[in-house]
């Protein structure tokens, strides 16, 4: 059974000057920690103030390439009387890196693919014999359409033991063709699906509907309860 979902996104190209060589495995879904006992994740009444953010990407390292997945949370803008609306929608950012040696990967040649909530739903609903494929074009509705194309595919192993996750990036501007393939086991894919299900309402901003946000403590124009680094926010940042 083949299940194919096509998504053509129109986003502007922008340059990235900062390498994610050291920090890319640490940046992602951020939350505050206020544990009163070192080494334990349970807050207490005497807990110290948060000392920083916790980052928890899920990474899979294989022989020819590595894959890292991390949620990018939406940003919000205050409109009136403390009300908020989404300014930039969230996504699940998939980062692929080619191998350059045993357990060594070239972070400078990474490529990213931002999954929308609907695309996340397609992966969550996949069965053991299902496939999914997504297409992104940053200039779909302009005269530059087709100059940079990304194709992400998820296909099952013939023996049902897992999936092949591959990303193809064709850049006619730079005249480059990048291709990454990361085989994942059933267990690894199960972790991804479970994590995706947990992250989905957060990248949609729906977690705010059931939580209480003190907007007085947030910036007046562009607010985000949990922020990610700018380098993770755009799929087309290189």
Swiss-Prot record:
GO terms of biological process kind: defense response; DNA repair; regulation of DNA-templated transcription
Subcellular location: Mitochondrion
Organelle transit peptide residues: 1-29
Gene: WHY2
The family this protein is said to belong to: Belongs to the Whirly family.
Gene3D superfamilies linked: Transcriptional Coactivator Pc4, Chain A (2.30.31.10)
Subunit field text: Homotetramer.
Keywords: DNA damage, DNA repair, Mitochondrion, Transit peptide
Function: Single-stranded DNA-binding protein that associates with mitochondrial DNA and may play a role in the regulation of the gene expression machinery. Also seems to be required to prevent break-induced DNA rearrangements in the mitochondrial genome. Can bind to melt double-stranded DNA in vivo.
InterPro entries in UniProt: ssDNA-bd_transcriptional_reg (IPR009044), Whirly (IPR013742)
Pfam families tied to this protein: Whirly (PF08536)
Highest taxon of source: Eukaryota
Miscellaneous notes: Plants over-expressing WHY2 are small with dark-green distorted leaves, exhibit early senescence and produces shorter siliques with half the amount of seeds found in wild-type plants.
Disruption phenotype: No visible phenotype under normal growth conditions.
GO molecular function: DNA binding; mRNA binding; single-stranded DNA binding
Segments of this protein annotated with the region Required for ssDNA binding: 62-67
Protein's name in the database: Single-stranded DNA-binding protein WHY2, mitochondrial
One GO CC term, this protein: DNA repair complex
